[in-house]
């Protein structure tokens, strides 16, 4: 809730795009490549072509757009910080929706992260269709 409170002005004053990658895509191409694919999709979903894209970390997606990688960028650049918050709020809301379909996993509370409770639910119920089969906590469950 506190993350999403301050987003009103960001949504009004900034351009943003979302890049969604499914759990099946992550399983096929690995988490790093999936992150780069999500970034690429988000950039391509922008309503404008950016003059420069700031990227948190050392890796950048393969696009013909000027980019600058910044290690720890979410704590240095306001634009990266805002993008990180927007992405987290979007994902949290998505997990709340998934909780309605898969209540046994309590996604509303754990947001899909590997909590003890979440792993216990996987042990008891098995995985559901949104779990990443390549995640070490899910392997052999």
Where are each of the predicted segments found?
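Structural motif
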Residues: 15-17, 51-53, 66-68, 84, ...
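C-terminal domain-closing interface element
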Residues: 16-41, 123-141
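Oxyanion/phosphate-interacting regions
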Residues: 73-141
């Amino acid at each position: 809730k506190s993350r999403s409170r301050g987003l009103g002005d960001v949504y009004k004053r900034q351009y943003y795009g979302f890049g969604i990658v499914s759990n099946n895509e992550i399983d096929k191409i690995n988490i790093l490549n999936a992150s780069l694919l999500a970034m690429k999709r988000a950039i391509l979903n922008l309503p404008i072509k950016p003059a420069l894209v700031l990227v948190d970390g050392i890796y950048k997606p393969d696009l013909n757009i000027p980019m600058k990688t910044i290690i720890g960028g979410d704590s240095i650049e306001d634009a990266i910080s805002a993008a990180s918050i927007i992405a987290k709020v979007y994902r949290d809301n998505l997990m709340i929706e998934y909780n309605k379909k898969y209540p046994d996993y309590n996604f509303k509370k754990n947001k899909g992260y590997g909590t003890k409770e979440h792993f216990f639910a996987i042990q008891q119920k098995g995985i559901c269709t949104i779990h990443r089969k390549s995640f070490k906590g899910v392997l052999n469950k």
